[in-house]
Amino acid sequence: MTMTIPEMVDVVFDISGDSVPVNYPFELWRELVRLVPELEGESSVGVLPLRTTGSDCGMLLPKRAKLVVRLPRSLATQTTPLSGQELNIGGSQLKIGKAKLREIQPYSTIHAHLVVATDDEVAFVENVSARLADLGITASLICGRQNSLLDGDQCVQGFSLVIHDLKPEDSLRLQYNGLGSDRKFGCGIFVPYKAISDLN
């Protein structure tokens, strides 16, 4: 018998800004909670990694950058106060614009840029396989490179992960549930993946 998982949606905000620091996930979450304190107590709420390009000035944001918050559909309206706000991310200013609701789609191949784990890749793959079995999901997986997020003494580490050959219902279940901890820092959140040969 598989567990009941709440239906999740993505709330997609337009954002404008030049760059964010390398350790932005920690500051970003603190700012979001400052503006919407209700988010802090919801372990299912996640913030998708921003699309950035590395440089000597930090992580550069594209002109059409988006901030995406994934959360249960029943909580989507809690993010409404974010529109029109300005975030201070380690000295970088981000202006949050309009929001729209985006339904999660059942792609057969999905990817998470970091699923929290120890540095033991074999144990990681075994744990992921066991977790998929717990969720009633049958699929193939490819473990990517080891990644980490640093913020002073705080370190979150793990591996990137591709899950493929998913049935539509299993794809939705996994995207709704995620894997591992620290969803608030962008970890364990799955998005569509087009080329399973690129695991960066």
Where are these regions (language model features)?
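RNA-interacting cores
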Residues: 1-200
